Design a protein with these regions (language model features):
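Short, surface-exposed ligand- or partner-binding patches at beta-edge/loop junctions that are enriched
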Residues: 63-64
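Rhodanese-like catalytic fold shared by cysteine-dependent sulfurtransferases
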Residues: 1-21, 27-59, 68-106
Length: 106
């Protein structure tokens, strides 16, 4: 089972209208710099206490700056019976490089 999705795969899903939740697990200061549209923001440290806000049956793409924190959150969610959860490989930074070069990078 793959725990990651590439930025190209996510873009393809969005282009065909696939319904998935974009879960941004970065800190508030990072979100204020740049965020993918229609994202749900729950900082990584708040995930355990806010787990009830997420639907375990939804397809969820978790992202952070480079893909490290998001992968940790994916493993945590899998341990809590979330079966359709993947991490955005390379994070929002790789999205900016590959998909939206005009996007703010930090």
């Amino acid at each position: 089972m793959s725990f990651e999705i590439t930025v190209q795969e996510l873009q393809a899903k969005q282009n065909v209208g696939t319904d998935c939740v974009l879960l941004d697990v970065r800190e508030q200061e990072e979100v204020e710099l740049v965020q993918l549209p229609n994202s749900v923001h729950i900082p990584m440290g708040d995930i355990p206490s806010r787990l009830h806000e997420l639907d375990p049956d939804s397809e969820i793409v978790v992202y952070c700056h480079h893909g490290v924190r998001s992968l940790q959150v994916v493993h945590f969610l899998h341990q809590h019976d979330f079966e359709h959860v993947v991490s955005l490989a390379g994070g929002i930074d790789f999205w900016a490089i590959e998909i939206e070069p005009e996007m703010t990078r930090y």
